[in-house]
């Protein structure tokens, strides 16, 4: 019974003021409660897998976690979309068993929806659909995510990483717990983007007006859903989103990608980008300094994102992450295309030492509060 309680309980935060800087929340400010919990399977379709076999595929497993008791005037619910090889557990708690972002936002009255992408975790995958891969060997995961300061300076800001709990290497219990949480995932970007766009649009239809918080690989999916449901998505928070526009960047190479700027598949521009983005013309803008990448932008006059332009956005970047050299390009591109976007470059705001997984690092609640302050205005 005790283990079941540990599994189902979330730590609920009392309403506390977060001062600026590196303020932390103490355990004395926490009380244990059990939020209202529902499990859903959303989206997907019946598909002919073989000549003699039908199946229902491409849906997502979803946990709905609501404040209990419900507040009288609740804020809009939040849909979380995790990044590559991750699941909804990213936001449930941290690998060293501290409260995650779900607990924080429930404490503020939000209902949260945690989910596993199609073909991942508790969401069905049938062998033969696309290409299924895995996160990579432990040392690579350490170098990119958890022990960035000792990765041989793979990007200029890497040495600034201080916020991961523990050593970030094999044998450290926090790293081992994090690595065990990694899941198989669809590596075909086009299949994955379309399946996620359809599944999460179905979830938005079910939820109604909401915010989306998407991380990393799921950045493109958050944008696709916003483009498809611009009447219901009231704000998009991008945690180091996929990108930058039109290209990959190290540590994942420099190949062309994201033909529609933010996505691989079509989103709405005015004038039209064309069926295959053939009408988008680009230029290269020099990097702002030696620690940042150059940006690929549209030629003027820039086409405007007609649907995404209706939705305010917040982009959040960790000081030491591999996104630090280029997320500013994504923000510039959004601005150029007519999106109302705010950039939380955490290091410049006095929140230091974070890598790509900042929502589970030592100061995760301070960053959650930064997001919450934005939500309160939107």
Regions found by a protein language model. Give the residues of each.
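Short beta-strand element of the alpha/beta-hydrolase
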Residues: 73-83
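Short beta-strand/loop motif that positions the catalytic acidic residue
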Residues: 309, 315-317
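Catalytic active-site module of serine/aspartate enzymes centered on a nucleophile-bearing elbow/loop
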Residues: 349-378
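Gly/Ala-rich beta-loop-alpha elbow adjacent to hydrolase catalytic centers
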Residues: 213-222
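Fungal secretory targeting signals
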Residues: 1-23
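Conserved acidic catalytic loop of the alpha/beta-hydrolase fold
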Residues: 70, 163-165, 169-176, 180-184, ...
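N-terminal cap/lid segment of alpha/beta-hydrolase-fold proteins
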Residues: 25-72
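Short substrate-entry loop that stabilizes the transition state in hydrolases
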Residues: 84-108, 113, 121-122, 245-246, ...
